A protein has these predicted regions:
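Gly/Ser-rich catalytic serine loop of serine hydrolases
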Residues: 41, 188-194
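Active-site entrance/lid segments in N-terminal catalytic domains of soluble metabolic enzymes
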Residues: 1-4, 12-184
Length: 365
């Protein structure tokens, strides 16, 4: 074991947790460690969230890719497995978002996270009922806006992050957000070990959030052969592409992504053909495709070209992450995928990160 696995010289509180790792976020979330497992669509199900919660971190359920009934069942399953706090990720543009919010309140879910900023009235409703509100931000101005609306914390994701992401790296974005708001800030984008946690705390953040690193655990339900592709991907093996749904998204470079990059989605007929081709691959019904597309068009400022692919993007990811159909080729990932080389359990991962962080903090004291 290298020096980062040691924690000699550091003190612990009465509950065995290093007080240097107790932050505004750990108090707000009710967890032992300032580590968050993000609500990755089709990945962060009850098993992963439960394992994360039992390890002392905050697991977030990916309800944004679930139906209302699936979300209710998933929350019940997590509740049956652990009494530790956890969170649920919601889509603000979902037609039934109000019902989802009501269910989170009824079930006393600790945290509601959002990829897009929730409306001010939704923030107020959740807060008034004891639910912590934490949206993701990719720019200082976004953080300032949601802070004015009263959110409890923000998850600040730099361009190293997976899935939909911005253009500013964490090292530049995080200090800006920290200077802009007075609520706890969770740093995301490129984090995968205890050195990153120690660095984030040194910056002034209240913790770190990780997606890809938790995807690559033995508790993740992603098929083993899909995990193998992730483990074989180099640091240079990812690309930020707008070819999937019109918005910048970091994915593993595959033949399908390369084809989409060459084809583009600049013209509706071509985009429609791509969407229909992928609909056949993913066996998505035309009705579901149209319903998803019209919902996105109504709630987001998308062109019809973007709608044509965006409507099917979630199904492309599902076919890969759930069914293991690599021929679809949509593999969202953070840039840290190139330096991850094992599949620990969530308990092993969190313990390792905590030990490494304590060791780094010792050397910086």
């Amino acid at each position: 074991m290298n020096s980062e696995g040691s924690s000699e010289g550091s003190s612990e509180g009465s509950n065995g947790v290093d007080p240097r790792l107790k932050t505004g976020a750990t108090e707000l979330f009710g967890v032992d460690y300032p580590i968050v497992q993000t609500g990755m669509g089709w990945v962060a199900g009850p098993s992963l969230v439960t394992a994360t919660a039992k390890a002392g971190a905050l697991g977030i359920l990916a309800a944004a890719t679930m139906t209302l009934e699936e979300m209710r069942a998933a929350i019940a399953e997590v509740r049956s497995r652990t009494d530790r706090p956890f969170g649920v990720n919601l889509r603000t543009d979902a037609a039934d978002v109000e019902q989802r919010v009501d269910h989170l309140i009824a079930e006393n879910v600790r945290v509601a996270s959002f990829a897009q900023a929730p409306r001010p009235d939704m923030v107020a409703k959740l807060k008034d009922n004891g639910v912590v509100v934490m949206p993701t931000v990719g720019a200082r101005r976004h953080a300032e806006k949601v802070a004015e609306w009263g959110v409890d914390a923000v998850l600040c994701q730099g361009s190293e992050g997976g899935g939909h992401t911005g253009t500013v790296p964490t090292s530049l974005l995080l200090p800006q957000v920290l200077d802009a708001v007075d609520v706890p800030v969770i740093a995301a984008g490129g984090f995968h070990d205890g050195r990153g946690l120690a660095a984030a705390l040194a910056w002034g953040a209240d913790g770190i959030a990780m997606g890809t690193r938790f995807l690559l655990t033995s508790d993740s339900r992603v098929p083993d052969w899909v995990k193998a592709v992730y483990l074989d991907t180099a640091v240079t093996g990812t690309v930020v592409s707008t070819a999937v749904d019109g918005a910048p998204q970091r994915v593993i470079r595959t033949e399908v992504i390369d084809t989409l990059e060459r084809t583009g989605i600049l013209k509706l007929p071509r985009a429609a053909l791509n969407a229909l081709r992928f609909r056949k691959l993913t066996e998505t019904s035309l009705r579901d495709l149209l319903r998803e597309g019209l919902s996105m068009k109504k709630n987001q400022d998308l062109t019809w070209s973007q709608v044509a692919m965006a409507a099917n993007a979630a199904m492309l990811t599902r076919a890969t992450m759930v069914e293991g159909r690599l021929e679809v080729g949509i593999l969202p990932t953070g840039q840290c995928v190139g330096v991850v080389d094992d599949l620990p359990s969530c308990e092993e991962l969190v313990s390792r990160i905590v030990s490494q962080a304590r060791a780094r903090l010792d050397t910086c004291a």
